[in-house]
Amino acid sequence: MAAAQVISNSGHDDMIHDAGLDYYGRRLATCSSDKTIKIFEIEGDTHKLVETLKGHEGPVWCVEWAHPKFGTILASSSYDGKVLIWREQHQSSTAPIGSGAWTKVFDFSLHTASVNMISWAPHETGCLLACASSDGHVSVLEFRDNSWTHQIFHAHGMGVNSISWAPAASPGSLVSSNPGIGQQRRFVTGGSDNLLKIWDYNPETKTYNATQTLEGHSDWVRDVAWSPSILSKSYIASASQDKTVRVWTADASNPGQWTSQVLEFDNVLWRVSWSPSGNILAVSGGDNKVSLWKENLRGQWEKVKDIEE
């Protein structure tokens, strides 16, 4: 198991809100209330600050690396209502990784309030970034034919806190008798209206439409995470201000029928995150602990480990 690396000298002048490793685990991006993003090179047990990105006018909540097939691209979102896309430009194709200069290649500023979370779609569906804002809207940015386009639409009346894409392949498609169905564009949002909504892309109208609403939480939905598993079931985890996590499950044979299991905690919950294989769920909240959960053979979710510093 990989050991945790502590970056004590982050260089930030204020609270750090998010951190993310790139696809290869060689670089770490962090963002802070000091309005900056910092990029570190990670090698073994050492790290080196290589770049500070400035462009936001408020606290930066979220940083997300794109898949490397699209280049070295980082997206950031902020309290200032902006989503910025940064790209590392190399002088030549043989230049080593980390040697390029970072530039801001797109500035999306149509949201009228804080952009709380951003999420890249599975790379099989294209270079797509979904953004969740306190103005109640979701935007989807797409990079295609060397230019950026966008859609923006209303999602939750009291604000959108979180967003997560479904896997590109639908559950059961790997063992389906009709495997050529294609890649789905689908995501889930969590809002301050206590609801989750599932959105599907309609290629004919080229719009995203809310196809399902999941009710159960009694307070704000702080985070949502769609499991990357594409076996026989779909799983969505949601973390709420109501001190519960719900694990929503839909079987491949009846994909529109979602049931949920409630996991109760003693504190407000902030984040949920799935392991790469989609079988272990990590939960973190106001007690500064992380707990790991797994589904047993009876279909019940049980805690397998507590992690605390």
Swiss-Prot record:
Domain of life: Eukaryota
MF (Gene Ontology): structural molecule activity
Gene Ontology CC: one annotated term: endoplasmic reticulum membrane
Listed Pfam families: WD40
Subcellular location: Cytoplasmic vesicle, COPII-coated vesicle membrane; Endoplasmic reticulum membrane; Nucleus, Nuclear pore complex
WD repeats: 11-50, 55-96, 110-151, 155-209, 216-258, 264-303
Broad class of the protein's primary localization: membrane
Entry keywords, A to Z: Cytoplasmic vesicle, Endoplasmic reticulum, ER-Golgi transport, Membrane, mRNA transport, Nuclear pore complex, Nucleus, Protein transport, Repeat, Translocation, Transport, WD repeat
Subunit organization: The COPII coat is composed of at least 5 proteins: the SEC23/24 complex, the SEC13/31 complex, and the protein SAR1. Component of the nuclear pore complex (NPC). NPC constitutes the exclusive means of nucleocytoplasmic transport. NPCs allow the passive diffusion of ions and small molecules and the active, nuclear transport receptor-mediated bidirectional transport of macromolecules such as proteins, RNAs, ribonucleoparticles (RNPs), and ribosomal subunits across the nuclear envelope. Due to its 8-fold rotational symmetry, all subunits are present with 8 copies or multiples thereof.
Family as reported in the entry's similarity comment: Belongs to the WD repeat SEC13 family.
Record's protein name: Protein transport protein sec13
Organism: Emericella nidulans (strain FGSC A4 / ATCC 38163 / CBS 112.46 / NRRL 194 / M139)
